[in-house]
Structure formats: structure tokens, C-alpha cells
């Protein structure tokens, strides 16, 4: 047995995927009379029963506003909400729960940094550096703040495998580079960026670094202190939690210096018509009544992931991805988009002569859920001279047997368009 085969065999025996699958009620659904094969977790992940139960229990036994009352229900809700903040800090090894800002998701976290930090420090002639791999949420906020400040947006190119050209990235760093904003993992291609190296080189140039971790957090453990990043953002719904909740981790000194992003209740210390003073970090960034039930569910999702052997889960996912890549590549009309040496969770491809949307419709009739389109990453499509791809994206609950179903469904697509 080769080392790679031995590793794959170990992954299949040390990680009990069938036990994990039983934790997710929706995986028992039938779609058009066929068992659901859910291969769209990069879009949004499914939710374990523990998350559903936690949210149900909150609404039944603790539903109240937080930080605003002394009655028991409010105290329960506040404890659950702040407990989730503490869990999030521990989950990414943040130094203190007060470095965790709870947001609506990754998109809001990036916009918050762009408008609160970026708009405060950027001046005409300054530069923000991103890469061609970015999700629109890590492009457009920087375009907006560059338009507002006169700063310039620079973009590091990628090679034909879908990897950032690190020499070109380094060449774009200069004393004018104030902010570097990069994805940890590409949502469209699955490329895992050498993020520690990128952070090190950006810091050497004097830049502050934001990492979009939306596609990384579901797959492997994150340690923001070890990485040394200044900001790290991610979403609950990508990691088995509810929608409408996310995290912005920020270096404490930066968060303290940043002005509020929005005004409203709970982000204030005192208000008069003449002057308002603001609450302490992180509360000055959390205006208004938050998605309390969602945050409670997010806390339960962290508990769920923390109870799993993350290393064994990643080995399992890598095995399924390698199997999927090999099996799908056997189909004569397939073209794989994104062949980086380091990938996780995503297989993006085309079927020659078949529009991805047509393929997606037929796959759905076979019970297979994939995403087709630009994946909120139009520049990547432009880079490869295409308009869209079929994207199969994986999570801890996917299996080799589901990949076999995908391949049979793709053969049916091929037959329809032959």
C-alpha cells in the first residue's frame, strides 16, 4: 500500500462519518424521490440537531433582549450570548473574548474593517492589496473605501493552478501598502493560501492584514495568535451554525482605536443632544438588538465542532476530495478548474458543451445539490476565460458513496447532451 493509500485508508477508519451523518436531520431528506446528496456546503452548511435544539431551547426558555434588563430571562439570554462570544474566542485562540465582535457574517465583518479602520487610515496614494482569488465580499468593500479615500486597490495575480503568485504578491508590497486583505481558502476553487507566509511578508512591509476565513474555519483549526493576523473574519452558517451570524476578530489595539461602524442602542455609554460617548470594545461595534437566537445556535455549532477530532475530520474530507477529483476526472468531457497543490473542500469543474446551469438542473433531479455559477467570484471566472463552473463542495458529512452518485448523475448529463 502506498503512503497516500495508507493515509486514505486510515481516514476512512478513524473518522466515523456515518455517526456524524446521523447528527444532521436534513441528510435523511429525499429530493425528487432520491436520497439527498448535499455537495453545496461552501454555499451554506447543514445544521446538526444540537444546533437546532439549542435555538429551540433559547426561544422556549430564554427569549429576551440582552444587556438591557435585570429580569431572569434577560440574564439567561445575556449569559448565552456572551457565552457564545467566549466560545468563539477559544475556537480561534483569540487572546480575549473582547477581541471578538459578533456580526451578521463575513461580509459585514469586512465592511466594518474597511469603513471603520480603512477609512480612518487610508489617504490618497495609499494602497490596499488583495488577490485574484477573492470573493466579491473581499473586493467590493475595498473598492468602496478606495473611492472614498483616494487610495488604490492592487491585485496579486494567480497562476493556472489557481494559486497566488507569491513573487508577484511580494513585488506589489511597498511602503504605500497599508492593508492586505486575503482569503484563507478560495470559495470558488478550494485553494488554501500560505496565509502565515503572506501575513509575515505583509507585516514586514508595514501593512495590516485581514484574513477572510469563511471557507477555512469549517475545515481546519484556526489559531489567530499563531498566524499573527490583525483581523480574521468568518461566518456561522459555513460551519454548521445558523445564518445571520459571524465573527470579526481584531487585534485589541486596533479595535480600541477604530471609530464605531454604526450608531444605535447598546453601542453607547451616554447620549445627549450635544455629544455621545461610546461603549467599550467590542460593544461599540454591535449597535441594535442582535440575532440572539442565531448567536446561541452559533455557540452550539462551536461546541459541536469542538467535540470532533478535527485532524481526523480533515483527513476524511481530503480523502473524499481526492476521490472526487479522480472519479470526476475520468469523465472525458470534464475540465477541472483549480488544481492547486493545497486544496480543501471544493471541486470546481466544467462539462465540455454543457452549460453549468443545465448540468445543475439535471443533477438536482438526481438528488444531487451543487452550486453552479460564478460563486461570487467573477474575476476568477474571467481569469480562466469562463463564465461559470459546477462546484461540488464538501463537509465532514460527505462520503465516497455520495461521490459515486455524483459521477453517475454527471454521466447522465453527458448522455443528455451527447
What is each residue range found by the language model?
Residues 1-418:
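Pyridoxal 5′-phosphate
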Amino acid at each position: 500500500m502506498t503512503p497516500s493509500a495508507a493515509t486514505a485508508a486510515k481516514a476512512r477508519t478513524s473518522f466515523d462519518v456515518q455517526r456524524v451523518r446521523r447528527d444532521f436531520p436534513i441528510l435523511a431528506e429525499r429530493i425528487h424521490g432520491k436520497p439527498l446528496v448535499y455537495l453545496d456546503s461552501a454555499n451554506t452548511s447543514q445544521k446538526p440537531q444540537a444546533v437546532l435544539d439549542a435555538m429551540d431551547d433559547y426561544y422556549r426558555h430564554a427569549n429576551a433582549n440582552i444587556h438591557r434588563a435585570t429580569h431572569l430571562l434577560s440574564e439567561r439570554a445575556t449569559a448565552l450570548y456572551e457565552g457564545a462570544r467566549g466560545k468563539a474566542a477559544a475556537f480561534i485562540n483569540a487572546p480575549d473574548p473582547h477581541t471578538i465582535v459578533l456580526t451578521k457574517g463575513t461580509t459585514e465583518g469586512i465592511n466594518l474593517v474597511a469603513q471603520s479602520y480603512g477609512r480612518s487610515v487610508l489617504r490618497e496614494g495609499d494602497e490596499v492589496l488583495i488577490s485574484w482569488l477573492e470573493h466579491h465580499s473581499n473586493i467590493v468593500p475595498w473598492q468602496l473605501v478606495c473611492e472614498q479615500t483616494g487610495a488604490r486597490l492592487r491585485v496579486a495575480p494567480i497562476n493556472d493552478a489557481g494559486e497566488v503568485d507569491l513573487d508577484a504578491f511580494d513585488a506589489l508590497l511597498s511602503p504605500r501598502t497599508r492593508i492586505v486583505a486575503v482569503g484563507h481558502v478560495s470559495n470558488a476553487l478550494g485553494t488554501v493560501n500560505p496565509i502565515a507566509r503572506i501575513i509575515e511578508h505583509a507585516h514586514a512591509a508595514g501593512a495590516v492584514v485581514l484574513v477572510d476565513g469563511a471557507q477555512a474555519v469549517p475545515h481546519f483549526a484556526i489559531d489567530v495568535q499563531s498566524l499573527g493576523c490583525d483581523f480574521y473574519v468568518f461566518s456561522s452558517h459555513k460551519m454548521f451554525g445558523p445564518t445571520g451570524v459571524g465573527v470579526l476578530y481584531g487585534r485589541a489595539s486596533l479595535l480600541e482605536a477604530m471609530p464605531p461602524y454604526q450608531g444605535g442602542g447598546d453601542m453607547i455609554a451616554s447620549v445627549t443632544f450635544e455629544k455621545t460617548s461610546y461603549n467599550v470594545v467590542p460593544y461599540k461595534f454591535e449597535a441594535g438588538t442582535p440575532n440572539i437566537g442565531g448567536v446561541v445556535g452559533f455557540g452550539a455549532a462551536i461546541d459541536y465542532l469542538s467535540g470532533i477530532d478535527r485532524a481526523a475530520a480533515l483527513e476524511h474530507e481530503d480523502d473524499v476530495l481526492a476521490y472526487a477529483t479522480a472519479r470526476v476526472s475520468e469523465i472525458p468531457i470534464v475540465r477541472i478548474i483549480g488544481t492547486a497543490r493545497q486544496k480543501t473542500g471544493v471541486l470546481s469543474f466544467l462539462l465540455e458543451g454543457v452549460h453549468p446551469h443545465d448540468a445543475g438542473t439535471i443533477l438536482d433531479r438526481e438528488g444531487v445539490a451543487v452550486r453552479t455559477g460564478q460563486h461570487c467570484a467573477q474575476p476568477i471566472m474571467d481569469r480562466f476565460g469562463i463564465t461559470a463552473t459546477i462546484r461540488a463542495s464538501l463537509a465532514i458529512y460527505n462520503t465516497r458513496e455520495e461521490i459515486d452518485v455524483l459521477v453517475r448523475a454527471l454521466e447522465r448529463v453527458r448522455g443528455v447532451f451527447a
